[in-house]
Amino acid sequence: MKKKSILLLVSFVILFVIAAGGCGKADGDKPLVVAMELAYPPFETRNDAGEPAGLSVDLMKAFGEYAGREIKIENTAWDGLIPSLQTGAADIVISSMTIRPDRARQVDFSDPYANALLAVLANADSGIETIESLNQPGKKIAVKSGSTGHLYAQDNLTEAELIILPDESACVTEVSQGRADGFIYDQLTVYRNWQNNPDTTAAIFIPFQEPEKWGIAVQKGNAGLLAQINAFLKEYKKEGGFDELTRVHLAEEKEAFDTLGFQWFFDMAD
């Protein structure tokens, strides 16, 4: 009986060790889930086959190679991005997200990887030439819900009427069809949409706020993953990774920004 008990105990210990080892391996091998809203080309979008594509996707693939982890992209509505980290549904969020104090209270951000200034896409017939000329009774401003442009307009353009919409394309449509006088968003997006709608829109690039910084977000307290992301960003920049992303995704915009004398998107202080 004693011998049988010892054998059972040994068997239990062996099974426990195997199970524990298997769990550890599963954690290390499971994909890193990256949440982003696939509605913001050329950063977060889909290719012709419907697969996730864009600059942010390529950046995360490079991080996966660096970390030795498979990357799984999850298309997530903008309002669900931060909650996806809080609930553990996602490990990482990268979605052209500005580092802001209110967001930093909910998630941890990486070191900034990009600069972005707000600009205005105006209706060509609106007569809008400055941000101040939007702040008048009777003026209508299209904003993407929850975006930095939305918050800026809400705090600073109180005389105008805000048209709050779910995505960038809806805002551009409001402006190009004359239902809104302007759309406040980042310079790159404004430039691209101005080029796509040259007869119905005008671009106002006069700076009216400090550059905002974009970061990669992780769940609050995930110091290990955050440190790994920061180390990757530093090495990726040093090795010319952001220059390659610019060449592939933003070559026309880089040339235009150089001509206009604007600070480039990825020109960050070391």
Tell where the protein language model's regions lie, with residue ranges.
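Flexible hinge/capping segments at coil-to-helix
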Residues: A122-K140
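Ligand-binding clefts/hinges and TM-proximal coupling segments of bilobed small-molecule sensing domains
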Residues: T148-L165, A202-I204, L233-D270
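Short helix-initiation/N-cap motifs at beta->coil->alpha
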Residues: K72-S84, I128-E129, S145, I163-Q177, ...
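Extended ligand-binding regions for polar small-molecule ligands
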Residues: V57-Y66, D125, E132, S145-S147, ...
